[in-house]
């Protein structure tokens, strides 16, 4: 387990990121800070690619009992959220 996420979840996120040409995924929030509780959601920021298809495949097909909060950073995102992502974020996928 890496970043308080099961390896299977990381593999599935990577698979869908490649499938939909996502440039980068950043884990942020309590799981990135290491302050998460067992049932904390998974906050990810997504850059580039086919966001809509990626979003729905992750929501419907990634095998996890945890909820995902998925943010598309390429569109209007508050300055506060951008700062949190930059401060606490951990890159969990980056296109080669």
Where are these regions (language model features)?
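Catalytic core of pol beta-like nucleotidyltransferases
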Residues: 1-26, 32-38, 47-96
């Amino acid at each position: 387990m890496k970043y308080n996420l099961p390896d299977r979840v990381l593999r599935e996120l990577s698979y869908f990121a490649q499938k939909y040409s996502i440039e980068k995924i950043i884990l942020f929030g309590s799981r990135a800070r290491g302050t998460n509780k067992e049932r904390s959601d998974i906050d990810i920021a997504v850059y580039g690619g086919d966001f809509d298809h990626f979003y729905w495949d992750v929501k419907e097909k990634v095998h996890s009992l945890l909820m995902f909060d998925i943010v598309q950073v390429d569109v209007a995102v508050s300055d506060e959220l951008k700062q949190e992502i930059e401060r606490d974020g951990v890159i969990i996928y980056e296109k080669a």
